[in-house]
Amino acid sequence: MNQAELQRHMEEVSLQFFQKEFRHQAVFNARLRTTGGRYLLKSHNIEMNPKYLENFGLAYFIGIMKHELCHYHLHIEKKGYQHRDQDFRELLKKVDAPRFCATIPREITMHEYTCKSCGKSFLRQRRFNVNRYRCGSCGGKLIQIGSKKIYTENA
């Protein structure tokens, strides 16, 4: 999906669920890390995180669009647009939009080291020079076995 398709989807979702036009811009912002989208109060534009579209699909992404459009329409109408406001919570329920986003799984590389003497195994996120360090248990020489990618739920 590109910027033009995002804009078109945002306008369609606004008309379908809110029966109101979306008159501002919707753009992708790949720098967003822990949030699915962001409504900008001054410009009235909406920024969307493209990683949520890649990881969770279009149906979930439309839910995030509905959430951001709740902020948008309530702010334009000068009603309570913040998460804690009653108007916002009621509109979320009415259009069946999520209140919070799921976290995107993060990819972490783990490096595995083993002691030549005692065979103890170590997992570390950072690589280190095996010639400079020794086993903490027996003082033996360490060798790097390899590295593997692990997906975590933390953001």
UniProtKB/Swiss-Prot annotation:
GO MF: zinc ion binding
UniProt-annotated location(s): Cytoplasm
Broad class of the protein's primary localization: cytoplasm
A Pfam family matched in the record: Zn_ribbon_SprT
Keywords: Cytoplasm, Metal-binding, Zinc
Binding site residues for Zn(2+): H67, H71
Cofactors demanded by this protein: Zn(2+)
Family statement: Belongs to the SprT family.
Protein name as catalogued: Protein SprT-like
Species of provenance: Listeria monocytogenes serotype 4a (strain HCC23)
